[in-house]
Amino acid sequence: MKTLLRTSALLLALAAALAACSKAPLTVPLEDFSISVDAVGNTAGQVVYPKNAAQFDRPVVDVKTIRLSGQVTVSYTAVQAPLVMTFYARTADPGAAGCTDAGLAWICDAAGETPISGEYSFANGETQQVTLGDPNPEVLADGINQGRIWIGAEVTSGAATGVTFDFTQMVAEVTVF
């Protein structure tokens, strides 16, 4: 994951520099990646973030907005299907923002968090188009500009174990103005 974020940050930095020269949005393809978690369940109005922020090199030119789009295939052992979730992002340290330290993760009240997607419903083995940074593309940009970001999820329905999210054909659309 760190290698992917480092590579993505470098590509986004290059994209931002090129977009600054052309004053046009730039589209950058990203490498495929996967995220695996042991278990997922209804978070009851809470957003769960990883304990540590994703960290990467800051771009040479600040970016204004970033939208990520592509395909996601979710595989899991269902306890209760489907998994229904919304993705969120934050740049402020959850520990300084009134979130609860749950050991391996931070738990924050969804009402105070910033969504970066609509709601998605994932059946086991299903592939679907997703967009992160719509709404609120500036949150992803702020994270890239600061060199760290937490990306989490609120699960509103479903429960599963052995969950893997395979992100493929991902593209970053970057604007600097």
Give residue spans per PLM region.
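Short, surface-exposed beta-strand/strand-loop-strand elements in extracellular ectodomains
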Residues: 79-98
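Sec-dependent bacterial lipoprotein signal peptides
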Residues: 1-21
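Short, low-complexity, Pro/Ser/Thr/Gly-rich segments in the mature regions of secreted, periplasmic
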Residues: 165-177
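Acidic Ser/Thr/Pro-rich low-complexity disordered segments
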Residues: 93-115
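Post-signal peptide N-terminal segment of mature Sec-exported envelope proteins
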Residues: 29-51
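Cysteine-clustered segments with highest specificity for TGF-beta superfamily mature ligands
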Residues: 114-168
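A short beta-strand element within beta-rich, extracytoplasmic domains
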Residues: 62-79, 168
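Bacterial lipoprotein signal-peptidase II cleavage site
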Residues: 22-29
